[in-house]
Amino acid sequence: MNLFGQTKKWSINQIINLVNNNSFFFDENENWKIDIELFLCSILKCKKTDLYLNFERVLNKLQLSELMHYIDRRKSNEPVQYIIQSSNFYGRKFFVDQNVFIPRPETERLIDITKEKTKNLKSPIIFDIGTGSGCISITLAIEIPDAQVLANDISKDAIDVARKNMNTYFVKNLQLINEDVFLNLGCNSLDILISNPPYIKLDEYFLLMPDVINFEPKAALTDRSNGLSFYKRIAELGNLKLNKGGWIILEVGKGKHPLEVREIFNNYDYDNIELFKDYNGDYRVIVAQN
């Protein structure tokens, strides 16, 4: 179905009004207005404010065709971030595709906490496990410019995405490693081990929304077990590789998951274990000191 027809000219204003008034085509339960604004910004290469400053701007046939293609993909539940190949994280835009997990706002707390834990360290060494798009490692390299940041991913495609983002921001203090860090990590003097590991239990994975389960990489979401296996491996790794006084900083799931993870680090004799809330008031980050 071609929503825009073949002949009529469509302005930004008319397109947005069409979305607001066409509940038959656009599901009322979806926030299509925001999606369309993002699509238009991507196609027209402009900011959201520019859309409303140039409300009468008319899209050409190629732009309308691209917009319709984006809408069709979104109606099949594909995430907006994959469609426009862009996601915001800590005030910066990152390239994303289906090879990497889409950055979430709650993950930004990892950055805040790491900056606090390293503020008195000179040239801290930070390792990001499972870097994906590189949003964590690149942001830390920029925000803590004297840090030496290392980041790994077992997926070469993910490393390619991270490298693309790294080059976009001309980051020089970051080394990307395409290896399994649990099998081979040469550095033995880390100040920070940081990660947003796969923490969704396998039985809960199949209950996720279609835009997640059908598009985002499964390996970034679940450990195919009880959601705790990576935390045990990271706890073991930290005992071996962290400096005395070094920190592990990890995202955790909701519900009982933070308490289950805290018990793991208790069992591995970590000190100063603490849970931190995200911007919604949920415990979503755990820190533990070696």
Please report, for each region that a protein language model flagged, where it lies by residue.
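Short, Lys/Arg-enriched, disordered terminal segments
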Residues: 1-28, 62, 116-123, 148, ...
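N-terminal auxiliary segments of SAM/dcSAM-dependent transferases
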Residues: 2-87
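Short, solvent-exposed loop/helix junctions and linker helices
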Residues: 9, 60-64, 101-105, 224-228, ...
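A general structural signal for well-ordered alpha-helical segments in protein cores
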Residues: 16, 36-37, 67, 77-80, ...
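Generic alpha-helical structural context detector
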Residues: 37-41, 69-72, 112, 138, ...
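SAM-dependent Rossmann-like transferase core, predominantly class I methyltransferases
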Residues: 55-57, 65-144, 149-164, 287
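S-adenosylmethionine
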Residues: 146-148, 152-290
